[in-house]
A protein has these predicted regions:
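A short glycine-rich, Lys/Arg-flanked "PGG" loop and its adjoining helix->strand segment in the class I
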Residues: 93-105
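A short His-aromatic
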Residues: 87-88
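C-terminal lobe and adjacent flexible extensions of AdoMet/dcAdoMet transferase-like proteins
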Residues: 163-169
């Protein structure tokens, strides 16, 4: 969560939506930086766990939903995160259309995925090859996002792809 918060420069003016939030670590990281944050996950059990371990409840909301169907109002988010979850999305195009819908003008998107090698199988394939990262960036551009960049970076010792961009103002 800290890497995502740094890469998107999250602060008190932000409303962060984390798609596929799991136990909510990154949602809490956003709240610690003063942002209001919503964790979205398809798993009610994960959301129960996230609620149970969250102390600062006033800045955080948990909702059941998927990337393709975000239960949030139009233009309500300034930042949307997908951290190691895009490879699980059923329909990336539909998910990006939903992200675009919930993002306010100038809103930022960040997707982080573990770097994987072409031809990897099993758990080693959970993530993106360089080509998959570039393909996701191209899809972001095709939905009207600007300043879309693909960066190679590290989350701890793990090499990750960071794809970020924003909506025009």
């Amino acid at each position: 969560g800290r890497l995502a918060a740094e890469l998107t420069d999250v602060g008190p003016a932000d409303v962060v939506v984390h798609i596929g939030c799991g136990a909510g670590n990154a949602v809490r990281a956003a709240a610690r930086r003063g942002a209001r944050a919503t964790g979205v996950d398809p798993s009610a059990a994960m959301l129960r766990m996230a609620r149970a371990v969250t102390r600062r409840r006033n800045a955080v909301t948990w909702v059941e939903g998927s990337a393709e169907s975000l239960p949030l109002p139009d233009g309500s988010a300034t930042v949307v995160w997908a951290l190691a979850t895009v490879h699980h999305w059923r329909d990336v195009g539909a998910a990006l259309a939903e992200i675009r819908r919930v993002l306010a003008p100038s809103g930022r998107i960040l997707a982080l995925e573990k770097q994987t090698q072409p031809g990897a199988t099993g758990r080693a394939s959970h993530g993106w090859t360089a080509q998959q990262a570039e393909s996701f960036a191209a899809l972001c551009r095709s939905t009207g996002m600007v300043e879309v960049e693909v960066k190679s970076t590290h989350a701890g010792r793990r090499a990750v792809w960071a794809v970020g961009g924003r909506l025009p103002s």
